[in-house]
Amino acid sequence: MKTNYIFVTGGVVSSLGKGIAAASLAAILEARGLNVTIMKLDPYINVDPGTMSPIQHGEVFVTEDGAETDLDLGHYERFIRTKMTRRNNFTTGRVYSEVLRKERRGDYLGATVQVIPHITNEIKDRIISGGEGHDVVLVEVGGTVGDIESLPFLEAIRQMAVEVGREHTLYLHLTLVPYLAAAGEVKTKPTQHSVKELLSIGIQPDILICRSDRVIPANERAKIALFCNVPEKAVISLKDVDSIYKIPGLLKSQGLDDYICKRFSLDCPEANLSEWEQVIYEEANPSGEVTIGMVGKYVELPDAYKSVIEALKHGGLKNRLTVNIKLLDSQDVETRGVELLKGLDAILVPGGFGGRGVEGKIMTARYARENNIPYLGICLGMQVALIEFSRHVAGLEKASSTEFEPDCRLPVVGLITEWRDEDGNLEVRSEESDLGGTMRVGGQPCHLTKDSLVRTLYGADTIVERHRHRYEVNNLLLKRIEDAGLRVAGRSVDNKLVEIIEIPDHPWFVACQFHPEFTSTPRDGHPLFTGFVKAAGKYQKGQLK
């Protein structure tokens, strides 16, 4: 079967939810037995989001193959079974970087390098290579139609229809249809102007998904169809819903998947959305609720922890519990004290970089340990738990990390090339090592310790989880910490690196170096988050032992 492409653009305003809409459509097509993937084209100049501020851009989603990508790829993986790779996300910066590299190498044989054809050809090549082997590829173009940054991408997808055939390309445009209370009606003019802008670039949309806070009346949909030159059945009303997992069913109920399959001449069975119906049922029928505190340093933008928040909700689904998440700034804990943590059923400390707010996280880990509150530490959340235990239980009062204190005498956490023992002797490791002084990123296998809590939770001896960090537990100081009662519950398969720690005499205290949130989905959940939320429910009822 030849690959079919659906190009998803947005108009009128930003943040309309193109990623959720594209992922929901992909979920329906996957439920019809099609092999589907999704790509995200980002118009910013950064080569990737890896060094961008989480407060500006939101979280960096890590793929199995180690790509640092846009958070929308997290939505994609939560909605479809296909795993994303580095081919599923690229930026203007990545494209220009590659074109300039080819120019320096002489690949263009002395030609004048221009946006058309060189930049647009590079974009098209990446779209085609990323879609190889799939029946349908959804391509989300970041930004809003009319933005100057998006023009090369829009020109490239316009050319795709010419090169792969109009019968294998489809343009889906997401717009806003606002409701004006003073007039008592929805207004279609912004959508008409957005489509006009798209037409000026040479793209006639085939489908319009119209976002609104209410169902768009049939007469208004007919008006949009007439003025935008789109069949009325291809004007889809997408009203606000209380759960994003209702969107696949909402789109299917309006025949969107049937329209697309007929457009591409695809003969496939009806979509079976029973899994999504089960998710919706679990979400709508909880048996109780818990409050989990998340103590981080980027809490002013919840999207900085998007996958963690979603994973906690998935854990709630699997336990039939509503999870209320209380976001707490670690600097506030540092300055105002652990009083802020009272009344919580569980505590999670997520990942982060740098020293700001770290002492507040260490105080949080201590509070959870001393008060027998369920604790889940992720990445930096594991490192602060280790530092706290080292200082207050193992007697290593000066324990710290070289990330926060480059000259600290007892670095229980450090770059592999910085490990020191108790006598201050530096153990020099090779700078050529894959881990020495570099970011450890992507899926890594981990062997779980026999009789550990995590081995029971996972039900497996070996797991693969995704990492994104530079600092590791210092093995040279580990024995003293283990002798004080800390358990290493998971190690890298070569037995060199600590991946998971537990406190056996605590009811539920687990911390991991990897990021389990990246592999949690609403249909399957994740063993750590499911177990964590279950522990929160038991703690609330006084049943956690």
UniProtKB/Swiss-Prot annotation:
Q: Which GO terms describe its cellular component?
A: cytosol
Keywords for the protein's UniProt record, in alphabetical order: ATP-binding, Glutamine amidotransferase, Ligase, Magnesium, Metal-binding, Nucleotide-binding, Pyrimidine biosynthesis
Q: Record-annotated residues binding L-glutamine?
A: 352, 380-383, 403, 470
Under CDD domains, the record lists: CTPS_N, GATase1_CTP_Synthase
The entry summarizes how activity is regulated as: Allosterically activated by GTP, when glutamine is the substrate; GTP has no effect on the reaction when ammonia is the substrate. The allosteric effector GTP functions by stabilizing the protein conformation that binds the tetrahedral intermediate(s) formed during glutamine hydrolysis. Inhibited by the product CTP, via allosteric rather than competitive inhibition.
Q: Which residues bind ATP?
A: 15-20, 72, 239-241
Top EC group = ligase
Biological-process GO terms, alphabetical = 'de novo' CTP biosynthetic process; pyrimidine nucleobase biosynthetic process
* Glutamine amidotransferase type-1 domain ranges (all copies): 291-542
- Region annotation Amidoligase domain: where it falls in the sequence: 1-266
- Which parts of the sequence bind Mg(2+)? 72, 140
Per the Swiss-Prot or TrEMBL record, the active site comprises: 379, 515, 517
Which InterPro entries does this one have?
Answer: Class_I_gatase-like, CTP_synthase, CTP_synthase_N, GATASE, GATase1_CTP_Synthase, P-loop_NTPase
Single GO MF descriptor: identical protein binding
Its family remark reads: Belongs to the CTP synthase family.
Matches recorded under NCBIfam families: PRK05380.1 (NF003792), PyrG (TIGR00337)
**Annotated function:** Catalyzes the ATP-dependent amination of UTP to CTP with either L-glutamine or ammonia as the source of nitrogen. Regulates intracellular CTP levels through interactions with the four ribonucleotide triphosphates.
Q: Look up the further comments and give them.
A: CTPSs have evolved a hybrid strategy for distinguishing between UTP and CTP. The overlapping regions of the product feedback inhibitory and substrate sites recognize a common feature in both compounds, the triphosphate moiety. To differentiate isosteric substrate and product pyrimidine rings, an additional pocket far from the expected kinase/ligase catalytic site, specifically recognizes the cytosine and ribose portions of the product inhibitor.
| The name this protein goes by in its record | CTP synthase
